[in-house]
């Protein structure tokens, strides 16, 4: 059995997830448990929808994660936005726990409106620490790296600093690496040794043990473009570097999600399977 355990993104309704996993031959998935474009209880799955997913996955060895709101900004200069960000993530964690997901992944926020990125990072660290203290037991947040504009957490060093400074245990606060974001932020993943270099960078920063999952996306744009434009594995500027990451021994036991349409993900899974960077179960 070679390569990472890779799966797909599936939009609600949640009841469709068990069947789609069977259809695509995978056991890993990402979904959302509310409207990602708004704060508040919009698009929260109905109890019957949740129950159908849970029942459909009963007895199956699946791994799933929810993606938090795209509006999350724990570094916002506005207290209203910071508080809404915390409330949104807490609500997502509650639903995720109720339906058996591994946790919630999220982007920490932006430096915009602060005198320096360091000031924004300090505020985000404080709010993230407060959030972790309020998390329900048995739930987990996964900090995802970013790549655009004034977003925080664009480098391995910066996400590592956040994780260290918050100081939460790995089972409460882990790391999710998006390969497209990392490449777009300037960490070149297009070479055959991409997996070695990434594992080395994470180990050097002391966060390899916090790594919980991947968004295994290729990139439409060159390294360092600082734009989030996903491509199907093997069809972008990372190319075989995606396989180098997915097949690396340090990552091969982790789950990975292709953040693409099901049709595009199907091609990506075929590419990874062909080159030894994927297994479904």
Give the residues covered by each predicted segment.
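Hydrophobic faces of well-ordered beta-strands that scaffold small-molecule active sites
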Residues: 4-10, 29-31, 64-68, 104-106, ...
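Active-site beta-loop-alpha junctions enriched in small/polar residues
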Residues: 7-13, 34-36, 69-71, 109-111, ...
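Acidic/histidine-rich catalytic cores of soluble enzymes
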Residues: 29, 130-231
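C-terminal active-site-proximal or functional interface alpha/beta core segments in diverse enzymes
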Residues: 135, 262-266
């Amino acid at each position: 059995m070679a390569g990472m355990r890779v799966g797909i993104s599936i939009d609600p309704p949640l009841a469709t997830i068990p069947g789609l996993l069977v259809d695509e031959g995978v056991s890993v998935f990402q979904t959302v448990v509310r409207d990602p474009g708004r704060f508040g209880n919009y698009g929260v799955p109905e109890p019957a929808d949740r129950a159908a997913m849970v029942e459909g996955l009963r007895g199956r060895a699946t791994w799933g994660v929810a993606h938090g709101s795209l509006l999350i900004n724990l570094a916002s200069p506005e207290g209203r936005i910071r508080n809404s960000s915390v409330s949104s993530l807490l609500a997502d964690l509650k639903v995720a726990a109720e339906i058996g997901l591994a946790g919630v992944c999220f982007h920490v926020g932006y430096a915009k409106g602060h005198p320096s990125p360091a000031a924004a990072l300090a505020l985000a660290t404080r709010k993230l620490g407060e959030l972790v203290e309020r998390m329900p037991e048995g739930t987990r947040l996964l900090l995802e790296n970013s790549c655009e504009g004034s977003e925080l957490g664009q480098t391995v060093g910066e996400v590592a600093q956040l994780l260290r400074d918050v100081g939460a245990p790995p089972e409460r606060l882990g790391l999710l690496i998006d390969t497209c974001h990392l490449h777009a932020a300037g960490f070149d993943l297009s070479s055959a040794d991409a997996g070695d270099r990434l594992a080395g960078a994470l180990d050097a920063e002391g966060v390899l043990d916090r790594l919980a999952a991947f968004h295994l996306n290729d990139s439409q744009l060159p390294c360092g473009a600082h734009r989030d434009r996903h491509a199907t594995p093997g069809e972008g500027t990372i190319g075989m570097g995606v396989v180098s990451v997915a097949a690396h021994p340090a990552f091969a036991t982790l789950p990975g999600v292709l953040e693409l349409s099901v049709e595009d993900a199907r091609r990506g899974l075929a590419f990874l399977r062909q080159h030894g960077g994927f297994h479904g179960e």
